């Protein structure tokens, strides 16, 4: 079965391209184009009244889509920003005792990695990093470090961006979280709409950040945060949008909304939310769930992994697969991460052949998604065999 018709505009721009970077810059479905146009039309139709519409209709719809996807009991625990870095800054600003004691890993995405390093340099944070390797013991080691205490904020990825390895200790970390600390922040960028994610049991204790750029098929500008009630109630870095609505706090001081709106910034571009809502409506109309899309991607990646193991992809078969496909139906990334000294060169040769992947250091990543078919994977295998 093919779903290419849902992506007709994007695919028509380069019909011969093989795009296996769905985990990086996912192609946008036609529904996102319709959302983009709707945003323009409504902005110009309603002009100054646009914001009434955005906050009455567009934002609540997006909140409901995310709450449904993640099993959140209250849509108003969701707030939006152009990117997840904005939320990291605001959450950490709310911990006013410095230096902030951070527990994290050596595998976090650059937005947090770089910021944490700079906080260390400035004396604003003391950072403890737990190694991902050996990953077989990661959950046990990271949980033990968290249970050891002495940390104000714990930051960890649901699925690690470079290796595609997924953690299994979110419940254990959530059990430690308290409004007075530690706060637990889960980076869900490679989990949201990539693998079925149910946060209903931990929604009252963890922060969860993600966005629309990857598996939500929405593009840039649609970062979001789930913020549990009672945690970080007065972030120091705060925008003027955070003072709209039902406010709380000392009458003589700066007041905040009680819901996730306490993390609003200032004037933002609402168009990405139009795209996101359009994509989610499309999925509902097509009867496609994250479980369905994940299963489709798993079938494609399993065939590619089989070809690698059988030597059908030339020298690519010499790479170490960091996130091999298991038979336990455990949450997993929507890409295969292959570690090899030639990863950069392989990616360049594939790009010259109009095959798009991406590379992180010595790891080349092949991402699978809704707009690919079994025939596309066979073409990919044939190209790899010819090139390598």
Task: Place the predicted regions along the sequence by residue.
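Pyridoxal 5′-phosphate
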Residues: 1-388
